[in-house]
Amino acid sequence: MTEIVTALIEQAACQIILDADGINALAAHKDVLQRAARPVVLTPHAGEFARLSGVKNASPEFLAQFAQENRCVLLYKGHRTLIAAPDGALYRNHSGNPGMAKGGCGDVLAGMLTALCGQGIPAVQAACAAAWLHGRAGDLAANTLSEYGMTPSDMLGLLPRVLKRYNSREW
């Protein structure tokens, strides 16, 4: 799998987004990030980032430094998701809640990020937007179903309500 991930990063003409095992496959070869045609988006939680960087409990400053040194966009998942850009900028998402710390929530986020990048939105902006929209859907799910009762599928189902509020078109 490592060879496939490395080859994709080096050769792909489209935006690459790596989550979960894609990040784990990259851990021993993170130098490939510097050879990518465009900044790769990585979406690790703390454990995945520790395997990738060798640093547990990374500070926001370290995340920004990592993104800058490795020419990547880092969407560091947590209760307050952080987005670090290749230029060293750091963004903090303030939507979301602890009920989102469930298996599958990161998959929903990765799918949202992929959809935004697929529409041509630049990676950093797409990462910030996906994190915020994901968190708002999580907040709506928690308000409706409770943090304990909500599931990633509930969040996905509530996403149209979140988007409708910010739709600029009058129908």
Predicted regions and their residues:
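Charged C-terminal helix
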Residues: 137-171
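Short, conserved loop/turn and helix-capping segments at secondary-structure boundaries
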Residues: 57-60, 99, 103, 149
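Short, small-residue alpha-helix embedded
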Residues: 51, 102-133
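Short beta-alpha connecting loops at secondary-structure transitions
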Residues: 47-53, 94-100, 110, 114, ...
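Glycine-rich phosphate/dinucleotide-binding loop and adjoining beta-alpha-beta core of small-molecule
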Residues: 1-95, 164-171
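Short, well-structured alpha-helical segments that form the helix of a local strand-helix-strand
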Residues: 59-68, 123-137, 152-160
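Short glycine- and Lys/Arg-enriched binding-loop motifs that mark or flank ligand-binding interfaces
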Residues: 18, 84, 92-95, 99-103, ...
